[in-house]
């Protein structure tokens, strides 16, 4: 049975990862695809490290944002804050190269959420992978 695609809501306009009004932000918009969220991103020179390469810190930010959205969306709206994240860089991401970002919620308890995310090229080559442990926000 096909899964209906849903776009995740904006929680803030100024977020570096997803805020549409942040002039230097990534402006990521995630879609729900069954048991994961996904988005696409094509890096520009604004996010360059070495000439022609996406900065590793931006890769970390993209993975963190994706895992945060997976945690929020796939747990039916629980807000959580990243407590620990691990990133494994596999291949360089090139400026101007379209990237696919996917993330999923892997574990949920009352106080903790765990998520994983992957950044890959269109041909399926994995650029980076990440995992995170997030603490449920006390306001939830």
Name each model-derived stretch.
Residues 1-6, 93-95, 104-140:
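HotDog/MaoC-like acyl-thioester-processing domains
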Residues 1-46:
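Non-catalytic linker/capping segments at the edges of enzyme domains
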Residues 26, 35, 81-83, 99, ...:
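Hydrophobic core residues within well-ordered beta-strands of beta-rich domains
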Residues 36, 54-77:
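Active-site helix/loop of acyl-thioester processing domains in fatty-acid/polyketide metabolism
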Residues 38-40, 86, 100-102, 114-116, ...:
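Beta-strand secondary-structure signal
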Residues 41-43, 89, 136:
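Hydrophobic residues in beta-strands and at strand termini
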Residues 45-57:
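Short histidine-centered catalytic/ligand-binding loop motif
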Residues 66-100:
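Hydrophobic beta-strand-centered segment that forms part of the acyl-chain substrate-binding groove
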């Amino acid at each position: 049975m096909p899964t209906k695609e849903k776009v995740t809501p904006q929680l803030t306009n100024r977020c570096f990862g997803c805020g549409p009004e942040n002039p230097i932000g990534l402006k990521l918009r995630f879609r729900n695809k069954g048991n994961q969220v996904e988005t696409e991103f094509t890096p520009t020179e604004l996010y360059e490290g070495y000439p022609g390469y996406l900065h590793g810190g931006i890769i970390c930010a993209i993975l963190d944002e994706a895992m945060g959205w997976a945690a929020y969306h796939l747990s039916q709206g629980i807000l959580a804050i990243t407590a620990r994240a691990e990133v494994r860089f596999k291949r360089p991401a090139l400026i101007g190269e379209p990237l696919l970002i996917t993330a999923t919620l892997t574990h949920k308890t009352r106080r903790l959420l765990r998520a994983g995310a992957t950044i890959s090229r269109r041909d399926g080559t994995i650029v980076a992978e990440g995992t995170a442990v997030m603490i449920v926000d006390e306001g939830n």
